[in-house]
Amino acid sequence: MAIKATDLSAIIKAQIKDFNQNVTFDEVGRVITVGDGIALVSGLNNVEYGELVQFESGVLGMTMNLEEDLVGIVVMGDDRSIVEGNLVKRMRQVISTPVGDELLGRVVNALAKPIDGKGKINTSYHAPIFKVAPGVMARQEVNEPLETGILAIDAMIPIGKGQRELIIGDRQTGKTAIAIDTILNQKGKHVYCIYIAIGQKNSTISQIVDILNKHDALKYTTIISASAAESAPLQYIAPYTGVTIAEEWMAKGKDVLVIYDDLSKHAVAYRTLSLLLRRPPGREAYPGDVFYLHSQLLERAARLNKENGGGSITALPIIETQAEDISAYIPTNVISITDGQIFTKESLFNSGQRPAIDIGYSVSRVGSAAQTKLMKKVVSSLKLELAQYNEMLAFAQFGSDLDQNTRNILEHGAKVYELLKQPQYSPYEQIKQILILFCSKYRLINPIPKAYITKYRDELLNYFLTNSKTLQVISQLTKASDWTEELIESVWEHIMAFNESFIPTIPNLNKYQGQEIPPLPWKAYKK
C-alpha cells in the first residue's frame, strides 16, 4: 500500500516536533582490574568519595579510594559480570535507602531491596545512609525505660530509650536470644524494631523471621539481611542502612530499637575491604579507622528533645568474643563507645543459668535513671546480695564449717539465681517482674527449697493474675508511681496467703530447715 504525500509530511512534522536538541553528558571511566569485589577504574577524575557509580552490566559500586590515577570502587553485587575495559558511569549521588512505614514487616537486603517474596516496597522517600549523628543540643537525657522483658536485665542492668547497650560474649551463649526476646517484649509498646543480621547463616535468619512471625512481632519489625553469602561491601553498609531507616522514624517522634548482630563480623567485612584496597593495616590487621567505623554508627542512636521530635533510637550492638577475651581490639573499642554492656558467659550457660548474664561484668551506665521507682526500690539491694553470694561461694569451696550468716547468704543467693532463670521467648511484663523481685527483697522465698523456686514463681504469678483480690493489687501497682507502706503491706499479705497454700504441697518439707520470713521493717520497729 502506497503512502500518501500528506501522510508522509504529517509523520515528518511529528518527528520534527518531538526532536530534542539537548545533549546529555556522562562522565565515564574504564575498568583496569576487577576481583574480590574491588574494581580499579581510570578516567573518573572528578568523582567524589562515597559516590555511587554504575558499571555497564547495571551493577552499582561505591568509591572508597581516590588515588592520583585510579579510583578504588567496591562492587555492590556480583563482580563476575564486570570485565576489564568496561565503562563505568558517575551517578552524581551518594548511596541511599528507601525509608518509611512500608518497610515494617519486611525482610530486605543491605540496599533495602525486598528478599521476602512479598513484592515491591513502594516508598516515597530515600535518605543517604552516611549521615552525621545528632548534635549535643538536639538530644535530651535518657530517662524512659526500654523494657526487655528479661528479669535480670530490667532489674540490674536497665536499658533506657536512646541508650547504646552492648551484648558481648562467646559464641552460643545466648546473645541473639536476648535481642530477640527484647523485640518480642516491645509488642503493644509502640516501639519499632530493626534487626540487622551481618554475616549470619541464611538458615539462622530464616529461623528468626519464623520466630517473630509466630509471636506476631514481625508487623513492627524490619529485618535487614547481609548474610555470610553476601559480599563484604554489602555486609559493610547493612548497619548504616538499618540506622538510616530508624532515623526517619525517630525524626517523626517514634521510639526505635536497632539490633546489630553482630559488629565483629561487620569489622571483619570492613577489614577485608580495606586490605583489598591496599590500605595500611594496624592492630590485628584492622585499618586505623575501625574505631570511627563503629563510633559514627553508634553515635546515631540518641534520644531527641521535644524541639527535634522527641523520638529515640536505642541500639543493642552484639560482639562475639574469643575465649571470653573482652580485652581484644574490637570488644574494647565497642565497650568504650557504648553506655554499658551485658556480658554472657559460657560456664553460666552450660550450668543451666539462662539467660547466662554475668552480673559482675555487666553494667548499665545510664539506664538506672530510666527505672521506675517501683522497680528501683525492689532491686536496691539485689546486686549487692548476688556479689556477696559469689564472694562467699568462692570461700565455701575451701571448707564446710560455715557460720549461720554465711549459710543464709549462700542459700538466699542460690534462690535468687533460680528466680532469675527465664525460658526463651517468654518475656515478663514489668508488674510480674516487680512481684518476683518483691519476694526476694522481703525474703518471702525463705521457706521454699531451691528446687521448688521456679515452680513457686510460676504459680505465684498465676495466682496473682487469676484471683479477683490480687487483680486489684495489680491494678494498684499499675497506677502507683512509688511504694507506700500500705501498698507494700497489701502485696506482702497476699504473697503470705499464697505461701500458706503453696508450702504444704512441697513433699518432704519437714527435712528442709529453711529460714523464717522476717517481719516488715516498720512492723518489727513498732513491736
Curated annotation (Swiss-Prot):
Keywords: ATP synthesis, ATP-binding, Cell membrane, CF(1), Hydrogen ion transport, Ion transport, Membrane, Nucleotide-binding, Translocase, Transport. The record marks S362 as: Required for activity. It is a peripheral membrane protein. InterPro entries: ATP_synth_asu-like_sf, ATP_synth_asu_C, ATP_synth_asu_C_sf, ATP_synth_F1_a_nt-bd_dom, ATP_synth_F1_asu, ATPase_a/bsu_AS, ATPase_F1/V1/A1_a/bsu_N, ATPase_F1/V1/A1_a/bsu_N_sf. PROSITE patterns: ATPASE_ALPHA_BETA (PS00152). It comes from the Bacteria. One of its GO terms (cellular component) is proton-transporting ATP synthase complex. It catalyses: ATP + H2O + 4 H(+)(in) = ADP + phosphate + 5 H(+)(out). Its main location: membrane. Pfam families: ATP-synt_ab, ATP-synt_ab_C, ATP-synt_ab_N. ATP binds at G169, D170, R171, Q172, T173, G174, K175, T176. It is found in: Cell membrane. Coiled coil: none annotated. Its EC number is 7.1.2.2. GO terms for molecular function: ADP binding; ATP binding; proton-transporting ATP synthase activity, rotational mechanism. Produces ATP from ADP in the presence of a proton gradient across the membrane. The alpha chain is a regulatory subunit. F-type ATPases have 2 components, CF(1) - the catalytic core - and CF(0) - the membrane proton channel. CF(1) has five subunits: alpha(3), beta(3), gamma(1), delta(1), epsilon(1). CF(0) has three main subunits: a(1), b(2) and c(9-12). The alpha and beta chains form an alternating ring which encloses part of the gamma chain. CF(1) is attached to CF(0) by a central stalk formed by the gamma and epsilon chains, while a peripheral stalk is formed by the delta and b chains. Belongs to the ATPase alpha/beta chains family. This is ATP synthase subunit alpha.
